[in-house]
Each structure stands twice: as C-alpha cells, then as structure tokens.
Amino acid sequence: MSRANPPSNSSGSRKISFNVSEQYDIQDVVGEGAYGVVCSAIHKPSGQKVAIKKITPFDHSMFCLRTLREMKLLRYFNHENIISILDIQKPRSYETFNEVYLIQELMETDMHRVIRTQDLSDDHCQYFIYQTLRALKAMHSANVLHRDLKPSNLLLNANCDLKVCDFGLARSAASQENNSGFMTEYVATRWYRAPEIMLTFKEYTKAIDVWSVGCILAEMLSGKPLFPGKDYHHQLTLILDVLGTPTMEDYYGIKSRRAREYIRSLPFKKKVPFRTLFPKTSDLALDLLEKLLAFNPVKRITVEEALKHPYLEPYHDPDDEPTAPPIPEEFFDFDKHKDNLSKEQLKQFIYQEIMR
C-alpha cells in the first residue's frame, strides 16, 4: 500500500493523499465533489489509464448510503454505456478503514463541459442521446431508476463514447416505498427533475429518467438548460411556461391537493411550440423532444419506444441494445432500513461490500 500525493488541485492550496496500491501511479486531480475527489492514474502492470475515486463518506449517513448504492450498482451492471468499476482498493483492516477507493475507467470529459465549450452537431446529439437511452434501457430492465441524470453525469471520451455515472441516488422501481420515504434525501439537480416529483403524482416511475433525458437533449440542441429554475416555484413556472397549463386529465393525475391548488392559482398559459424555441433543429429531433417532455408521466415515451424513434434510426439496433436481469428483491434492503441504521452499521455494510 503506498501513500501517494498527486499534484495539488487548481487552487494550489493543498495536497490530496491517496492510500492506494503501489500498482497505481497517481497523476492529476480531474474532479472534486461534496465527499470525494477523482484522480487520473496509470495501472503500472498493464499501462492502462484509470480514474481513482477517493470517497470519504463516513461523516454523514447520506454519503454512506450513496456510496453503498454506487458500489453495488456499478458492480451489478456490465454495459458499454455505464461506467464500470475495475477494482476497489481493499482496506488493510476495518479499524483503519476510513476511505473508499473505486478504480474506474478514465473518461476525458463530461457532457456539461462539452455543452459549455462547443456547439453540438445534430449527429452528435443523436449519438449521445442514443447511448444515454441504451444505458437507460439496461437500468430500467433491471428495475433501477437512476434519478439523477444530468449532463455532468454523462462521461465522454474523444471518440464520443458515452457512459452514465453516479448511481448514488438510484432506487428500485419495483418496490414503491411510500413516496415521502422515496423523496427524503432527494437532492437531484432541480433543472432535470420531472414535474411529478415536485407535484407528488400517484407514484414515481421510470418516466422520471425519461424526462431528464428530454432536458439533456434540449440542452444539447440549444447550448443552455431548458428549465434553469432558481427554486421549486420558479422551476414549475418555467416548465408550465413552455408546456402550457396541464389538461384536466393531467391535472387530476396530480395526487397532492396543495399542488393542484397551486397550479390552479397560476394564470392560464398556452403551450409554446418547440419549433419557436429551437428554430434550427430538425423536425425529428423536436418530435422526440415533445415525447420525452410530456407533462404527464403516463403519456411520456418509454426508453424502448424512444430507441425506436426515427430520430435515432441511424444508430438503433434492436440486436445490440442489451437488457439486464432484474435486481434481486433484497438488493436495496439497506435502503428500507436506512432511517434506523447508524453510521457504524453503514460502514460495516460498505466494508463487507468491498471485501466480498
């Protein structure tokens, strides 16, 4: 086990220590988040470039839960468009265990950075959305909701390969916890959040991920977020400004009386044609966008239907869009009991997952 210091991050204010095997030569800091840092590294025996994600989750139960979900799900899926875990650094002992190191494929950038720095061609948009939906088909067939799809969670490399990452908010679609439990700790980026999450529809379904894909496609087409809400009310207002006031049928699909009353209190809004918002975009792209961004989740296109949409015809291949087996019922057992689990118990779960 070596204690390696990668180059300090851009602020230049501190070094970041990585307690990883001497098989890895640590290179540069490539990303930082709330409870972790990612460095590029070289696996010396093979010469392979990898990303090492150092996570320090044990201060907060929420970070422990996210880490556990991430490890379990990334190990479960084996898919070209889902980031894979190549290895997990085994700790020396439980007593000294206070950091998690995930070794993953190294990707060069992410969709957020790409959208900010360049205009995407129609062909790029097709290929990136196709790959995102291809990954989502595997997740949804396994009864997994990602719940946090956004441009920064779509990793890219120079030849336009796309891989979905960050499964820390994922849940089983099969076991409907009561919706309040489902929503606790829901910190997904507001801009990509489906309206039913804010309006508490009867249940949350795979359609919440489809909405996020619609928001991402819109952002790729225009170079800016479609619904950049500053808060809950602003977010809903922006959505209704574009989609118009819900029909009576859609209105009564909203479970929460308070949410219904709030929508009734708003002035009537006419739908804005997507053609007005995206004047240079192809008809097929706009047709898919309409179907991805249906207000009512019941009317929203499914992932399978979206893959067959004419806009994605250049890439669609039904023989090369694999599913994944449904996750076992006990897969997310720890989530069912999360409110009663101590940080120490969660740490034990993470340790067991690493050592298995």
Swiss-Prot record:
Its EC number is 2.7.11.24. CDD domains: STKc_ERK1_2_like. Disruption phenotype: Impairs the formation of appressoria and the ability to infect rice plants, even when inoculated onto wounded leaves. Leads to decreased transcription of the cell surface sensors MSB2 and SHO1. Blocks the transcription of both virulence genes GAS1 and GAS2 during appressorium formation. The keyword ATP-binding applies. GO terms for biological process: MAPK cascade; positive regulation of appressorium formation. GO terms for molecular function: ATP binding; MAP kinase activity; protein serine kinase activity. Coiled coil: none annotated. It catalyses: L-seryl-[protein] + ATP = O-phospho-L-seryl-[protein] + ADP + H(+); L-threonyl-[protein] + ATP = O-phospho-L-threonyl-[protein] + ADP + H(+). Mitogen-activated protein kinase; part of the MST11-MST7-PMK1 MAP kinase (MAPK) cascade that is essential for appressorium formation, penetration and invasive growth. Central regulator of appressorium development that acts downstream of the cAMP signal. The MST11-MST7-PMK1 MAP kinase cascade transduces signals from the cell surface sensors MDB2 and SHO1 that recognize various surface signals such as surface hydrophobicity, cutin monomers, and rice leaf waxes. Belongs to the protein kinase superfamily. CMGC Ser/Thr protein kinase family. MAP kinase subfamily. This is Mitogen-activated protein kinase PMK1. It comes from Pyricularia oryzae (Rice blast fungus). The lineage of its organism: Eukaryota, Fungi, Dikarya, Ascomycota, Pezizomycotina.
